[in-house]
């Protein structure tokens, strides 16, 4: 078990609780510090529940199945004040899952807790039971919940011992039961979005006819209403003093009708998608269990967040802070930053989005100039070009990894200032007898996609001329292309006798493995075999482009993050199935997965089964199966073909798109379109 790492969050909080209606204010300043610790529990199975008192924290976990015949029984662990972990031996005689835990006694003499678990009865029906246990795992009492099992099937979100019985948070109400498992009442009804409780108090967040509210279960009254549903719809916990709210992936402090932002989960290294469960200790400490993946080798942590009193010494190990900025930061980037932060002892990355409108672009440019950010992110290479002069030379950024061939070759064209953690492939087809592809998108995407495939023929940059005959052919191709999403469905499109022009974006190997319908006949189709008789181009679309800002005082730390992005550990866990990784070993892992012909276990512990998927379109079946050796060889050969990075939009490309779209929308004639393109583009080329 790794040692707890403590770091100081330079964050603030106000005290008190006020009127009934609460609004969320992300600009309101807070004034009391918070500290956060993290405990590495990666050696435990995925956590399903937690509770704790002054002596121990109790954890419920559910092992991952590694064999179809393996029986999965819940596991219970205890962590003491010295972070020593002990597994308790509880008499689980049936397979099942623990959904919630609750501390019962927090006295210094004896620690007891309760757990609520679900299992299958002998007749195959679902059964629920509460076990009351001591600190060694000895079961003092079992309580059958047969009477309310149907109500619990909709979901169980929390358990709290109180006044000799229990509160159970279900999906549509909070139930009160006695010590024998008999239902006493529905304490409150409505959609339950969050639940928390200690012996000091119990509350829930609910959505009812009166709106979104925090409800005190002991006093049976609304504490306050919440105005902005968007900000509180994903509540994880509510400390029992009612002055703190953990919801919408942020911690808020409530005072006088306003909830002030204290910190976002990302600030302490957690992405909301990683959070498994949350609980509150009697002293108000929040525990958040987070895991960065679903496989056996995923990292797992418990984050411990505390309020620091005004006179307390909050000095801890302060981390080096890096700021990653961008106009719009992608989900992949946010997950990468959260995963990186979870494993770091000395470095913390925070993210700042400036927006993609004109004002946001200006603010981002000023932040670069003023040295306010260390790392720059963009989803698209062309958006990074304008900031190239602000970025460090990263020509050595790929020297330490075995990189897949198309990325290595394409990067020589992109320059030396960018790091790309993964990529997708785009395949362009002009109209031809074999070019039957299904196109996603409307006029603008059609023009955009085909123009990159054709523009080198249409425009003669050296002689500053436009080939109007090729331009006319391009316009005709685009005009005749079916707009699949607007006018037709997949079966009708595939049954059409008319050749279909299109562009396909290859995000993962499964995109190659289709058996599609042409007419009513099922035929093999893979995105790389059926080249059209016209031009054929492969281009790499980067999945995230990163750069180190020139002048950053933490260049070494920034480089470490970029090495992490392109390294084996991160890429093998996160690349598939969203995109092709740049790391060769990570790519090989994908080949092992998609070509499996029998159940097997990869060296990293991943269970692999032969892949097969069936999808029905209007009674027509599309089947995807595992790749055979020949298909796999074809894909590898296709990936080794010469590739170029998806280019920056040049001004003349935008002009052509603009005029062609006007023609497609019947705003002008074909002859006028050819004339306008010729004139406008010639002026740009002359400049």
Model-inferred region functions:
Residues 602-681:
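C-terminal capping/gating helix-and-loop segments adjacent to ligand/active sites or protein-protein/ligand interfaces
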Residues 481-564, 570, 578, 588, ...:
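Extracytoplasmic/periplasmic substrate-binding proteins
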Residues 380-428, 519-535:
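Hinge/lid segment of periplasmic solute-binding proteins
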Residues 395-403, 457-476, 530-537:
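Short, solvent-exposed loop/beta-turn-alpha elements that line the ligand-binding surface or hinge
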Residues 156, 358-376, 483, 487-512, ...:
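Short helices/loops that flank or line small-molecule/ion binding pockets
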Residues 18-52, 57-70, 74-77, 119, ...:
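Conserved N-terminal structural module of periplasmic/extracytoplasmic solute-binding proteins
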Residues 13-16:
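C-terminal motif of bacterial Sec signal peptides marking the signal peptidase cleavage site
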Residues 413-427, 434-479, 489-507:
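Extracytoplasmic/periplasmic solute-binding protein
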């Amino acid at each position: 078990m790794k040692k707890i790492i403590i770091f100081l969050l330079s964050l603030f909080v106000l005290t008190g609780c006020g009127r009934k209606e609460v609004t969320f204010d992300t600009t309101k300043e807070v004034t009391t510090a918070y500290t956060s610790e993290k405990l590495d529990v990666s050696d435990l199975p995925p956590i399903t529940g937690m509770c704790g008192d002054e002596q121990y924290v109790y954890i419920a976990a559910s092992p991952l199945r590694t064999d179809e015949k393996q029986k999965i029984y819940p596991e219970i662990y205890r962590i003491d004040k010295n972070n020593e972990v002990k597994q308790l031996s509880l008499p689980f005689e049936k397979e099942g899952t623990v959904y919630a835990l609750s501390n019962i006694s927090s006295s210094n003499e004896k620690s007891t807790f309760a757990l609520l678990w679900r299992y299958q009865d002998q007749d195959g029906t679902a059964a629920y039971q509460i076990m009351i246990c001591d600190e060694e795992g000895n079961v003092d009492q079992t309580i059958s919940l047969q009477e309310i099992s149907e109500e619990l099937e909709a979901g169980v979100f929390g358990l709290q011992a109180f006044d000799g019985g229990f509160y159970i948070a279900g999906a549509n109400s909070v139930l009160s039961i006695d010590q024998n498992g008999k239902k006493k009442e529905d304490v409150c009804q409505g959609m339950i979005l969050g639940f928390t409780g200690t012996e000091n108090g119990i509350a829930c967040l609910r959505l009812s006819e009166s709106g979104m509210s925090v409800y005190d279960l002991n006093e049976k009254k609304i504490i306050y209403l919440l105005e902005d549903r968007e900000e509180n719809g994903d509540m994880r916990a509510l400390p029992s003093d009612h002055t703190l709210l953990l919801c919408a992936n942020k911690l808020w402090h409530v005072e006088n009708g306003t909830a002030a932002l204290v910190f976002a989960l990302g600030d302490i290294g957690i992405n909301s998608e990683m959070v498994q469960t949350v609980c509150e200790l009697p002293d108000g400490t929040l525990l958040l269990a987070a895991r960065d993946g679903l496989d056996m080798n995923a990292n797992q942590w418990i984050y411990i967040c505390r309020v620091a009193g005004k006179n307390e010494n909050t000095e801890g190990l302060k981390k080096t802070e890096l700021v990653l900025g961008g106009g719009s930061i992608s989900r992949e980037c946010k997950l990468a930053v959260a995963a990186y932060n979870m494993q770091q002892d000395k470095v913390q990355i925070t993210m700042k989005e400036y927006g993609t409108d004109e004002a946001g672009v200006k603010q981002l440019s000023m932040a670069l100039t003023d040295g306010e950010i260390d790392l720059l992110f963009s989803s698209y290479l062309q958006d990074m070009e304008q900031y190239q002069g602000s970025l460090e030379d990263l020509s050595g950024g790929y020297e330490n990894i075995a990189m897949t061939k198309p990325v290595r070759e394409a990067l020589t064209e992109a320059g030396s200032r960018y790091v790309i953690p993964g990529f997708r492939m785009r395949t362009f087809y002009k109209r031809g007898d074999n070019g039957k592809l299904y196109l996603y998108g409307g006029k603008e995407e059609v023009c955009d996609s085909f123009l990159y495939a054709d523009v080198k023929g249409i425009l003669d940059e050296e002689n500053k001329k436009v080939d109007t005959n090729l331009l006319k052919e391009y316009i005709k191709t685009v005009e005749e292309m079916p707009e699949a999403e607007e006018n037709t469905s997949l079966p009708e499109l595939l049954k059409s006798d008319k050749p279909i022009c299109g562009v396909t974006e290859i995000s993962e190997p499964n995109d190659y493995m289709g058996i599609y319908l042409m007419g009513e006949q099922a035929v093999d189709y893979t995105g790389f075999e059926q080249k059209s008789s016209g031009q054929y181009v492969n281009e790499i679309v980067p999945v995230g482009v990163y750069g180190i800002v020139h002048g950053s005082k933490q260049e070494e730390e920034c480089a470490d993050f970029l090495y992490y992005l392109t390294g084996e550990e991160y890429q093998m866990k996160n690349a598939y199935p969203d995109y092709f990784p740049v790391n060769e070993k990570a790519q090989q892992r994908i080949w092992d997965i998609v070509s499996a012909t029998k159940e097997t276990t990869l060296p990293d512990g991943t269970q692999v089964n032969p892949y097969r998927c069936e999808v029905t379109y209007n009674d027509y079946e599309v089947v995807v199966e595992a790749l055979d050796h020949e298909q796999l060889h074809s894909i590898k050969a296709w990936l080794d073909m010469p590739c170029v990075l998806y280019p920056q939009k040049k001004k003349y490309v935008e002009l052509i798109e603009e005029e062609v779209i006007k023609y497609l929308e019947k705003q002008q004639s074909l002859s006028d379109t050819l004339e306008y393109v010729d004139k406008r583009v010639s002026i740009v080329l002359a400049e």
